[in-house]
Amino acid sequence: MTYQQVLENARTCIGPYCKACNDCNGKVCRNTMPGPGAKGEGTGFIRNAEKWREICVNMDTICENSQVDTSFTLFGRTFEIPAFAAPVGAMRLHYGDKYDDLAYNDILVRACANAGILAFTGDGTDPKVVEGAAEALKANGGCGVPTIKPWDMDTICEKFALVQESEPFAIAMDIDAAGLPFLQGLTPPAGSKSVEELKQIV
């Protein structure tokens, strides 16, 4: 399957915010909430895409003619390439009805494990999202990184305890999600974390 075929297939079942553009640069989906594009000024995604383009891989032809080794080691574990799958949550809200979070995480974690890399899994207001991610990670030897939103401390501890049962490679928190609308106005408060709170989490 070519990249163009992947995009054409995606356009039949993705949306309404992601357009499966030929060039995924955040311009068409900018300032959509919810959605994959950056909120506010809508430049975060665009700037990230521009920065990626500054990184180039140059072919070296003055070397031994052998298989290129793209592997690297992180925290004592070796992976096939220095790239991991990013965490995505609320699949149907952002990307259409084809996959819910449970089905998506099951496919993603298994595929990444088979490819020799890690899958970061998402989080959301539905507790089943993290529960499903934990199940997928456990079924694949903990080959992934569950990513928890910056909830209140009690909820964070509950979710950490849940995902630790799957013995994941690591656990992450996308603290920049503090600006998401669904975290605003919660009781107890969710969102930004003080240095002291971060010390408790780490």
Which residues does each predicted region cover?
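An N-cap/entry alpha-helix motif that binds or orients negatively charged groups
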Residues: 2-80
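Conserved active-site and cofactor/substrate-binding residues in soluble primary-metabolism enzymes
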Residues: 39-47, 103, 107, 154, ...
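Short alpha-helical segments and helix-capping/turn motifs at coil-helix boundaries
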Residues: 67-72, 106, 131, 155-161
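Metal-dependent C-N hydrolase catalytic cores
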Residues: 77-96, 100, 104-105, 115
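Hydrophobic faces of well-ordered beta-strands that scaffold small-molecule active sites
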Residues: 83-86, 117-121, 142-148, 171
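Active-site mouth loops of central-metabolism enzymes
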Residues: 88-101, 145-154, 185-189
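A glycine-rich phosphate/pyrophosphate-binding beta-strand-loop-alpha-helix module
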Residues: 103-143
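Alpha/beta enzyme core
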Residues: 110, 138-139, 151-202
